[in-house]
Regions:
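Substrate-recognition/specificity elements adjacent to catalytic centers across diverse enzyme folds
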Residues: 3-177
């Protein structure tokens, strides 16, 4: 039988008979604890932050839509193997069940902003993965280039080539690793 135990630190431990139940429970418990945050992620993936948080985020929506996060995520779902899609669907079903449970009495953040949590589907999950990959990879390339130039030519040449390079954010050369 499936069971969930929440430890003294508030961390849920899920014991499931199969992967579908595991992913469903993971989605449900994530939404139970972080529904507002997850809703902001959902709006972000779709490039619709301004619809939830105001017109000052239109530039963010334009940026996210320019990168075609959601469009690409939809295509990615179509390229995934059926088992992976099934598990992502189970995860989304858990989230959506939690949304249904609280829909008529939403957490305070939703009431204050007068918004409803959007439903989840596999393209939101893969879109969030794409957003995170982009976010985490956005600064590594310049740092590698800076480090290579500094290691090969020295710090003075680096500053000559990149005059705006800051010593406050030094690169870590390969020999330092």
């Amino acid at each position: 039988r499936d069971s969930i135990y929440t430890d003294t630190f508030g961390v849920p431990h899920i014991f499931a008979q199969n992967e579908d139940d595991l992913f469903y429970a993971a989605g449900y418990y994530a939404a139970r604890d972080r529904l507002f945050q997850m809703s902001i992620v959902n709006f972000s993936v779709r490039g619709e932050l301004s619809s939830a948080l105001g017109d000052e985020l239109i530039d963010s929506d334009i940026y996210l839509r320019t990168w075609r996060i959601h469009d690409t995520a939809k295509k990615l779902v179509g390229e995934l193997d059926p088992q992976t899609v099934q598990l992502i669907n189970a995860f989304c079903a858990g989230i959506n069940y939690r949304i249904q449970e609280v829909y008529n009495d939403l957490p305070i953040e939703f009431k204050l902003l007068q918004i409803k949590p959007p439903a989840w589907n596999p393209s939101i999950v893969t879109g969030y993965g794409r957003m995170m990959a982009r976010e985490m990879s956005s600064s590594w390339k310049p740092e590698i280039v800076y480090g290579a130039i500094e290691n090969y030519f020295g710090k003075e040449k680096l500053k000559e080539i990149y005059p705006y390079y800051s010593d406050e954010h030094p690169t870590i050369g390969c020999s330092s690793l």
